Amino acid sequence: MEGVISAPAPPRIPSPDADDLTIRDARPEDAAAVDRLDARITELAKPDYWREIFARFSGRPDSHILIAEVGGRLRGFIIGEVRAWEFGSPPSGWIFAIGVHPDHRLNKLGSRLFEAMCQRLRESGVKTVRTMLARDDNLNMAFFRSQGMMGGPFTQLEMPLD
């Protein structure tokens, strides 16, 4: 076809078997691996940020960092918590970070992490899960929409302070 640019599809890693995939609570020693995966995705290493997140979430019953391992290697993470009464919102779950190794994006690893986080949030008693994305974050927008998320009743506003 004239005018069509095509590129070979990226290699696809087979979907992990249930026996090969483990979703578990993060441990403090996972912070460095999460930072490495996040840096691979975002091209920005943030080790101090991840140490702070891991320290802040440690021991809090309504805050969760979940890790996805395939064959014993960290291949994804998701972070969420219950937040209550911000701007009149009843308690709800918030997902504020998710990362999946690029080689594992087409095999439902992100969906399994999302489902596991939603289950944790349900167990905390909330009935809604929310997130916030940059308008141009098409990858995560497509992912969260594929999970059934859609625009909610709140609008985020901001202004520069300089």
PLM segments and residue spans:
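Conserved GNAT acetyl-CoA-binding A-motif
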Residues: 121-132
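A short, internal acetyl-CoA/4′-phosphopantetheine-binding micro-motif in the GNAT/acyltransferase core
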Residues: 97-105
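Conserved beta-strand-loop-alpha-helix junction that forms the acyl-donor binding cleft
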Residues: 131-140, 158, 162
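Acetyl-CoA-dependent GNAT
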Residues: 16, 25-28, 36, 40-90, ...
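Conserved acetyl-CoA-binding loop-helix of GNAT-fold acetyltransferases
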Residues: 106-119, 146
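Active-site/acyl-donor-binding loops of N-acyltransferases
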Residues: 2-6, 147-162
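Conserved active-site alpha-helix within GNAT-family acetyltransferase domains
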Residues: 111, 135-153
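Conserved N-terminal entry element of GNAT/NAT acetyltransferase domains
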Residues: 1-29, 162
